Amino acid sequence: MLFVGTALQLFLGAVNASLLAYPLGIVLAANYLYLLILISFNKEKWKWTAHFTGRATYITSLTAMLVLTIIFGLVRQDGAEGAMGALGFSQMKNSWTFNIFLLHFASVIGVKSIDDLRNIKNQKLHTAVMHTAFFIILLAGIFGSGDKQRVTLTTIQGEPTNIGVAEDGKKTELPFIIRLKDFSLEEYPPHIHIYADDNLSKEHIIIKEKGDSATLGKWHIECKEYLEMAGCKPGDSLYRPMNHVGATTAIHVRATAGSDTVEGWISCGSHIFPGSALQLPDGQMLAMPRREVKKYLSQVEVSTGDEIKNFDIAVNSPATIGAWKIYQSGYDNARGRWSTTSTFECVKDSWQPATHAAMWLILAAGVFALFANRTKKKRK
């Protein structure tokens, strides 16, 4: 299989998963499953089926997949050329070698699952269920790969759109329209660093409110005024409260070290107001870098033609529209909390319900096995 996979990789190039797109993927999956059933029923008659049965085959196939998976993890998957690229190791999921071994491994598990189900009276129920569920995951992963779509869509607040960019860079029309209603962003409290020799110190202090104080290096720093939303007129160093687009965080601090005392404003700035630092007598400065983002959320309206739904989309909290999931993947970093654009990754995986069902079966089989073992111990 290694020789065949390498030869196909060198002569044909990477595997084109789009060839398995609906309906061909389902047709091939059905025929593949039928072939495995034939193998299970005729393994004693067909000698060549020994390549899919037996303990030695299980161990060999599993070991091969483990080795390839380790290579998958160690080699950067950037599609680079050269020797590694020619052999498919820099793009393993589209490598002939990897996919041939994966198909063989799935076939071994598939035949074993069918055997377990045929001899359910002689097999542990949870073992049969676990093998079958694992096979379903592999089947969906292989034959459903052509149906997976990833489309990146950038929306501007108030402007509905359904045109995104696919992985191949082509513009793609989505079966739904997204309109960004509002964007919100939550940040961690400001960090104050010492800036010297064009570098920020690793050591820092956190200021949350007026009256906070801490020591940074040799300087004792006290917050005299804290403005979450502030602005500064051009040419002025005084920050005033401002609830308007572009408002930034500004802190008035007093820094003391021995007989040296300085006061002034520190700000991280925004896309409108430049940041400001406090000059210290020793040539260093107190500076506030851009605040770290804690979480961000987009309130959107999604229209499918038949209905309109509202969603709050955040990282790890996607919206679901039919077979599509809409993930929050970015925003206008320059504008930060004042971003008027959101970037979404729209992912379609028609085989995902089968995968989810299989994972629940694995969980159920594990729980059943746990209680079954406890019952046996009690009987003994």
What are these regions (language model features)?
Residues 1-380:
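Solvent-exposed, non-transmembrane regions of integral membrane proteins
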